[in-house]
Amino acid sequence: MHAPPTPPTAPRTRLRTRALGFAALAVAMLMSVPTAQTAFGEEAAAVPGGGDLGPNVHVFDPSTPDIQGKVDEIFKKQESAQFGLDRHALMFKPGTYDNINAQIGFYTQIAGLGLNPNDTTFNGDVTVDAGWFDGNATQNFWRSAENLTLNPVSGTNRWAVSQAAPFRRMHVKGGLNLAPDGYGWASGGYIADSKIDGEVGPYSQQQWYTRDSSVGGWVNGVWNMTFSGVEGAPANSFPEPPYTTLDTTPISREKPFLYLDGADYKVFVPEKRENARGVSWADGTPAGESIPLDQFYVVKEGADAATINAAVEQGLHLLFTPGVYHIDETININRADTVALGLGLATIIPDNGVTAIKVGDVDGVKLAGLLVDAGPVNSETLIEVGPENASADHSANPTSLQDVFVRIGGAGPGKATTSIVVNSDDVIIDHTWVWRADHGEGWG
């Protein structure tokens, strides 16, 4: 049997911080809108909150005709589009969906729109396999599944992914297979806040991290299987078998997510948890805050950084709809408790060497669901959290980065000196992949 390949080497990442939490529109409207004061005391049109979710968010309910056909159409486009420009979010309203096999390709997010994963049930599967790459799953990147309950047709759901492909807030009423058909190589992976009633079978997976979840058993390990706060996890036994197990997760927070409250879209922002074990939703409604969509600037392709920054300064949160966003100035988030949530692997590219995102040394900013892709002009940094020498105590309400990914090259020439700099204290980094391309275009 061949040994699995070594995973791609990540770019240099400088994390300057005293304490890290555990873990790894387009144009402002000019008519009939409120006004705001500019820095020079002038009246400026305010950026409106709310609105529709744009063309790349596909919303389904149980009565939608030919759901399988639409899902298959998107998968056909995205199955092998590793460095493509399309982005998609498949959103399912609460209810029961029969005979669904949602195959998930690159830059595709599938999610339920309930407050609890059990609100949206598939009598079927959410599948990732590796047929496009001859059974090798080591390049199954950049996709996600969230907030659904699955009754797999065969009794076991297949989620054969590698990096940057989270499985969050999922309830699988059966088993979960993390390997591709044929047990080819795979280099995952991440599960959080999920309940797997049956066994999880990594099989050919090189490594995996599972956090604050519940499993009915764990079959094997190859290099390292890591668990924190997981009910049913195997006992700590590294290196043979290669299980690293913590009974609880010292500090964690679940990722914000979009949901429907009746007919109204809201974003739920979970509370910080201490010494967590098991899922956050076991008793029904999780602890946290619901924010109406009209308190968000719904960012769509074509939006510029100036408008995004104006929205934040005005007091709005940010919801990036699926798309690719080219910016010519830094997105600055200096207001405490701001949520910046991306759908469908929303991608930010700094075109002229600026830092893509800077977060101030403030409490409780939530960055989630974003891919920052280095541009052709070198950026000294791509993401910064807090200025140099930041020293404020944020332990009661830390900033968090969740499913925030960085890429340098692959989709084209990309240059950056340092990917992520964390200067603020107490920051929670919950699932990231910081990748300097070893294939594609513009790498090396």
Regions found by a protein language model. Name each.
Residues 6, 22, 41:
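Alpha-helical and His/Cys-centered functional microenvironments
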Residues 42-444:
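Extracellular/periplasmic carbohydrate-active domains that bind, remodel
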Residues 12, 16-21, 187:
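Generic alpha-helix initiation/capping and coil-helix boundary signal
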Residues 21-34:
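Bacterial N-terminal signal peptides
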Residues 31-46:
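C-terminal region of N-terminal signal peptides and the immediate post-cleavage residues
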Residues 1-16:
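N-terminal secretory signal peptides that target proteins for export/translocation
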